[in-house]
Amino acid sequence: MVKFLLLALALGVSCAHYQNLEVSPSEVDGKWYSLYIAADNKEKVSEGGPLRAYIKNVECIDECQTLKITFYTKVEGVCQEHTIVGRKGEDGKYITDFSGQNYFHIVEKSDDTMTFHNVNVDDSGKTNVILVVGRGESSSIEQKQRFEKTAEEYDIPKENIEDLVPTDNCDQ
């Protein structure tokens, strides 16, 4: 019995990063900047990739049962603005359509950053994406190290991490 309880505890701790964080409008609403993005399919988040998102604004609606996110992508170097509306499902993940079906949630938050995990499902399969956004236009070494650890937890190789700050010239 003790072995079973220890196993259950170990599994609970190892899967803790998959829990959805509850957020309030005061934590979410406002201007954000994309800092880092990574995916298990790097093509999707590389320069010109369909999931390389430059977040600009997040709005919490109905006590965060809905998130409205305004962001840019680049097609052949040209910025294109998009707005998606994600509705929270029973499992706590937000669901929306953009370049396929997306299931996302906030996995980490602090006063000045939020980290999203997204599963994108399209004709080519399933892609795990993580994205960290900040209130400021730059990040610290500690934020990058924390993001690298989160990427590792989602089995995304460190070499798949993209620094978005140098290429974010949309909405300026």
UniProtKB/Swiss-Prot annotation:
InterPro entries: Calycin, Lipocalin, Lipocalin_CS, Lipocln_cytosolic_FA-bd_dom, OBP-like. It comes from the Eukaryota. Pfam families: Lipocalin. Its main location: secreted. One of its GO terms (cellular component) is extracellular space. Coiled coil: none annotated. Disulfide bonds join 60-64, 79-170. The keyword Disulfide bond applies. Induction: Repressed by estrogens, androgens and thyroxine in adults (at protein level). Repression by estrogens and androgens does not occur in immature 20-day old animals. Induced by prolonged light deprivation and starvation (at protein level). GO terms for molecular function: odorant binding; small molecule binding. Residues 1-16 form the signal peptide. PROSITE patterns: LIPOCALIN. The keyword Signal applies. Expressed in the lacrimal gland from where it is secreted into tears (at protein level). It is found in: Secreted. Belongs to the calycin superfamily. Lipocalin family. This is Female-specific lacrimal gland protein. It comes from Mesocricetus auratus (Golden hamster).
